[in-house]
A protein has these predicted regions:
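Acidic, glycine-rich loop-and-beta core segments that form the ion-binding/anion-interacting portion
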Residues: 1-7, 11
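Non-catalytic, membrane-anchoring transmembrane segments at the edges
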Residues: 2, 14-33, 37-225
């Protein structure tokens, strides 16, 4: 009988960082808005104070995720991005939607580097390598768990693809990720129109069985650390 609040609503479809935070971790955003942003004065005390309040809110958001400099930088980056969007105003809205999406997606992934890096030095080294090159190819640990059984079967059926399976795995996971994030209805929207049928039950059972058979290990839920 409990109705849980929606927490994510296809955040990677966002056309701005401001919109991203209306779709990403919505319960945390609501908490910070009600308990930090509004008590600080919100947007009622002038433009400069509004910008400062935004920076404080996202600084706290970073610290909430972890007491480290990487999380602080991540939070301040998101705060600074939203201040910049406010300063830019309607001029940004006049840009084509595809360009606004690319800008937002690029920024989000840049900020995630700091979120996931063990320290600032590691984040800086990764960003430097991304600009200058020198990654040295795809690391095996990155793809070893992706579609392992499926590609083993593919290599048996078509040995000629064996030299390219690593690149095919990366292309498949990136393509599937983008497709899942950008194209179909998310689970929340899907449940609004979902009607159980024999076909949907069989499809769900097949996908569930495929997922179970594809297990390669246990991954700790990332938010267990927060």
């Amino acid at each position: 009988g409990l109705r849980l609040p929606v927490n994510f609503d296809s955040p990677y479809r966002s056309l701005s960082v401001t919109e991203f935070w209306k779709r990403w971790h919505m319960t945390l955003t609501a908490f910070l808005r009600e308990c930090v942003y509004f008590p600080l004065g919100g947007s009622r005390r002038g433009q400069g104070r509004t910008y400062l309040n935004i920076l404080v809110v996202y600084l706290i958001s970073g610290i909430w995720h972890g007491a480290g400099w990487t999380f602080i930088v991540w939070g301040l980056l998101h705060g600074a991005a939203q201040v910049t969007e406010r300063l830019w105003g309607g001029r940004r809205d006049a840009l084509p939607k595809w360009l606004r999406w690319v800008m937002t997606f690029f920024f989000l992934n840049l900020a995630w580097v700091f979120f996931r890096a063990p320290d600032i030095s590691a984040a800086a080294a990764l960003l430097k390598t991304a600009v200058t090159g020198g990654f040295g190819g795809i690391r095996p640990w990155l793809v070893n768990g992706l579609f392992r059984r499926e590609f083993s079967a593919l290599e048996l059926l078509a040995p000629a693809v064996r030299p390219y399976t690593t690149y095919l795995r990366v292309a498949l996971i990136l393509g599937a990720g983008l497709l899942t994030a950008l194209w179909p209805r998310n689970t929340v929207r899907q449940m609004e129109v979902f009607r159980p049928t024999v076909r949907s039950c069989l499809t769900t059972a097949l996908l569930a069985a495929w997922s179970i058979l594809s297990f390669t290990g246990v991954v700790t839920f990332i938010y267990s650390n927060f």
